[in-house]
Regions:
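Membrane-interfacial terminal anchoring regions of lipid-handling membrane enzymes
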Residues: 1-195
């Protein structure tokens, strides 16, 4: 940690080359909130009623878990759902009733949960994935084999997006986040028929 003492108060900062170390400690702390953060976002996917609404919630939570699997360590699918429900039970004891009533009741439930963790916990990762997606769209078709070039392009684009205030977290402009986003893209492309 560097300390700047020349101003009216001390400012503590990480050296520019300490990004991976900081990410390790940050992710260690975020790990305590990640399941609840995923629950917050998964609640937004509910549009049906009854058991179908619960299925939508679970499926979205599992989809998000899969999307962040290179950032965090998760339990297996069944154990994750049990943990997800337990975490939500702690914050909103009657959540199942609200979810089964559909989208409107679920949004009302979400508005009453404090603190909401999804946006603050997951924003840097989602913004990084969006920057990488934009960088991919800017590449000529068939020319994404050079990952280092793509990551450098995403870093430049990310810096631009921060300066334009189109993304909120400077932390999102991260080579390691972009590397993980590329892994997700490659997995997704393998699932598309005729590729």
């Amino acid at each position: 940690i560097n300390i700047f003492n020349d101003g009216i108060e001390s400012v503590y900062m990480l050296p520019n080359d300490a990004g991976r170390t900081a990410a390790y400690y940050r992710n260690g702390l975020i790990h305590f909130f990640i399941t609840s953060a995923i629950a917050d976002l998964a609640l937004l996917a509910v549009s049906a009623t009854g058991d179908e609404a619960l299925s939508q919630f679970h499926n979205e939570a599992l989809r998000l878990r899969d999307m962040f699997k290179y950032e965090f360590f998760f339990e297996g699918s069944s154990a994750f759902i049990v943990l997800l429900e337990h975490e939500l039970e702690q914050r909103a004891p009657n959540w199942r009733d609200s979810v089964k009533q559909g989208a409107k009741a679920t949004r009302k439930l979400l508005a009453g949960i404090t603190p909401i963790l999804g946006h603050g916990t997951l924003r840097p990762f989602i913004e990084a994935y969006l920057v990488l997606a934009r960088a991919l769209r800017m590449q000529p078709v068939g020319e994404i084999s050079d990952q280092k070039h793509l990551i450098n392009h995403a870093l430049t684009l990310g810096k631009q997006r921060v300066l334009q205030k189109r993304i909120h977290c400077e932390e999102s402009v991260s080579g390691s986040y972009f590397e993980n986003a590329i892994k997700i893209v490659c997995e997704t492309l393998k699932k598309i028929p005729n590729r």
